């Protein structure tokens, strides 16, 4: 309960601090470096868990830097777009964002990579109002999804389970099938 209480307090206090502290937008380079270094540490010293390198252990405490990086990444992109939305600056920000995603893909943390990618696309659109950037991003994301399907067996397994949860009931489809049973029995609202 102590951790939950601390989390609630942080959720209430941090927005107030962010509104009061204007200099946070000047640390974009620090945000980019912290994000990339945090993810790179996992690639170097991380332990493999269920096929992915998600974190490491220090003094018996499991640390998963990708959770912190999701927040730091938002600060990085926001401060970069506040500084400039000229095309050359967008390219630099996109390269740094792509490096974040690439490190996550190398460590097989595809869920975090997808979150970072989608967050970047949404923030890019909000900052520039250019639908072409969204279309290009969706095209690149589609190519990445096809590549992930062919490169990672666990992605292929998940797609097959999604396509036929009852055919793969004993080999990965159990949870999907049970959720379909629950929806069929109780509907969306139980």
Task: Name each model feature, range by range.
Residues 1-175:
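Hydrophobic alpha-helical transmembrane segments of multi-pass inner membrane proteins, especially
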Residues 175-190:
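Oxyanion-binding "anion nests"
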